[in-house]
C-alpha cells in the first residue's frame, strides 16, 4: 500500500531546488530548524548512554535540513525521500559542506524491510502522505527493540487551521499557498489509536509555538498547532491514553 500522494510530490518537485534558500519557500523550516535539532538531539542523548554508533533514519528528508546537520555532528544518518530531485539537492549540499550522509531515493515501503534503526525521524511529512496509518506503522516497524521514533506534524484544530493555513499561507506568506490540506492534519489521539495494536507507545508530546513578541519559535506544552511526538516500545506500566 503506497503512501505516495502524487499531487503532493508535484508541488514539492517544483521547488526542490530551493531547499537551502533561507529566504525561499522553505524559509520557515530554516527558522524552526534550530529548535527541531535541539529537541531531537536532547531526546537521543537522554535515551542512549552511548551515541557513537547509533544509526538514524530520516524519512521524507526533503533537501536534508535535518539529516545533514545531524550527520555533521557525528551521527550515522540514512535519509530517504520519494523525490529524486530532493535527494540530488540534499546530496549536493552535503558534499559541498564535507558532510557524509547516506541519501537514497526511496519510500518507506521500498526500504529494506529487515533493516532497523536506533532512531527514526519523520518531520513535517505525515500530513502530506496517503494511507497515513500504514505509513506510521511502517515507520515504527524500522525501530530497533530499544529504539525510538520522533515525528512532528500539525494538529487538526480550529487554531491550527487559522494559524497554520490562513495566517501562515495567506497572511504572512511563510509557506506557499495550498501547502497544507486541513483534512490531512492529525490529532495526537488519532496516532495513539493507530498504534493501539502495536508494541509502540507515545512517550512524549511537545508543542512548537511562535512567540510574536520575541519573533521566535520555542518548545511549549501547547500542542494545538505544531507538535513533536516521541515514540518507543511499550513498558509494563499502563500507557496513558491520549485524548487530544
From Swiss-Prot:
SUPFAM superfamilies: S-adenosyl-L-methionine-dependent methyltransferases. HAMAP family: UbiG. S-adenosyl-L-methionine binds at residues 36, 60, 81, 123. Its EC number is 2.1.1.222, 2.1.1.64. One of its GO terms (biological process) is methylation. The keyword Methyltransferase applies. O-methyltransferase that catalyzes the 2 O-methylation steps in the ubiquinone biosynthetic pathway. The keyword Transferase applies. GO terms for molecular function: 2-polyprenyl-6-hydroxyphenol methylase activity; 3-demethylubiquinol 3-O-methyltransferase activity; polyprenyldihydroxybenzoate methyltransferase activity. Keywords: Methyltransferase, S-adenosyl-L-methionine, Transferase, Ubiquinone biosynthesis. This is Ubiquinone biosynthesis O-methyltransferase. InterPro entries: Methyltransf_11 (IPR013216), SAM-dependent_MTases_sf (IPR029063), UbiG_MeTrfase (IPR010233). It holds the Pfam family Methyltransf_11. Belongs to the methyltransferase superfamily. UbiG/COQ3 family. Pathway: Cofactor biosynthesis; ubiquinone biosynthesis. It catalyses: a 3-demethylubiquinol + S-adenosyl-L-methionine = a ubiquinol + S-adenosyl-L-homocysteine + H(+); a 3-(all-trans-polyprenyl)benzene-1,2-diol + S-adenosyl-L-methionine = a 2-methoxy-6-(all-trans-polyprenyl)phenol + S-adenosyl-L-homocysteine + H(+).
